[in-house]
Amino acid sequence: MAIERTFSIIKPNAVAKNVIGSIFSRFEAAGFKIVGTKMLHLTVEQARGFYAEHEGRPFFDGLVEFMTSGPIVVSVLEGENAVQRHRDLLGATNPANALAGTLRADYADSFTENGTHGSDSVESAAREIAFFFAEGEVCPRTR
């Protein structure tokens, strides 16, 4: 299998629950290397830009409001088949459908406040990583 990079967000509701370390531990236990991470508080402009593909949908304004309601943690994860494996670890977008033991089953509050985000493709991951990380902010780990 190919080594891939994927993008992850720990959303404001999960940050507020003080479970960042628990989530990182689960990433590492699943075999991911964390090769980039930072905490930030999105501006409305940043949130609208990141979620631009959803503009015009009924949930867009609520999503922007939620994503700007508190700090988030953005990360780049590396590993074999990283995009799909990360999505499997997150669980279904709607936490009501998330399997027990997934991050969304454990940390989500609702469909919008589902605790986490993960890229849905290698192409999306590259775009999302570039949105938040400048050249040199992602550090390859060879050891």
From Swiss-Prot:
Task: Locate the residues binding ATP.
Answer: 11, 59, 87, 93, 104, 114
Alphabetized CDD domains for the sequence: NDPk_I
A Pfam family recorded for this sequence = NDK
Q: Which GO terms describe its molecular function?
A: ATP binding; metal ion binding; nucleoside diphosphate kinase activity
Q: Does the keyword Phosphoprotein apply?
A: yes
Q: Which GO terms describe its cellular component?
A: cytoplasm
Q: Could you say which cofactors this protein requires? A: Mg(2+)
Asked if the keyword Magnesium belongs to this entry, the reply reads: yes
**A GO biological process held by the record:** GTP biosynthetic process
Keywords noted in UniProt: ATP-binding, Cytoplasm, Kinase, Magnesium, Metal-binding, Nucleotide metabolism, Nucleotide-binding, Phosphoprotein, Transferase
Please give the Gene3D superfamilies that the UniProt record associates with this protein: Nucleoside diphosphate kinase-like domain
- Top-level lineage group: Bacteria
Describe its assembly: Homotetramer.
**HAMAP family, per database record:** NDP_kinase
Q: What does this protein do?
A: Major role in the synthesis of nucleoside triphosphates other than ATP. The ATP gamma phosphate is transferred to the NDP beta phosphate via a ping-pong mechanism, using a phosphorylated active-site intermediate.
Protein family according to the UniProt entry: Belongs to the NDK family.
**Name assigned to this protein:** Nucleoside diphosphate kinase
As recorded in Swiss-Prot or TrEMBL, the protein's gene is named: ndk
